[in-house]
């Protein structure tokens, strides 16, 4: 439960790309709650590895809890809510909605993905339409299929 509640704490995309601030804040909070060291480490690993940007690294920590939280996080990123979130974030970052002169990129690594400043439209092809194939649980796969279909309509 703690991993689900804290997985987006101080999300790096709202902190100039700083991927350490979330785990540090969570660790401080968890220590104040006298959480066991093993549970603390497990929650911190969930926070560190839940993001899509870490899907380019095959050496990351995995657990059933992380898989479930990844699925839930990715389900939030697709479908009607995902479309709204995409354009909302694009507006927040002052990105173009569409530019025919900016090609869609198939990101091969975390750095390429994180450094992208592509228009919101490109994000559909660079991430959102890929998510249905990255689900772990049967329930998430079924829900992702429906939400994926909604996006391509």
Predicted features and spans:
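Divalent metal-dependent phosphate-bond-processing catalytic cores, especially two-metal-ion Mg2+/Mn2+ enzymes
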Residues: 6, 55-153
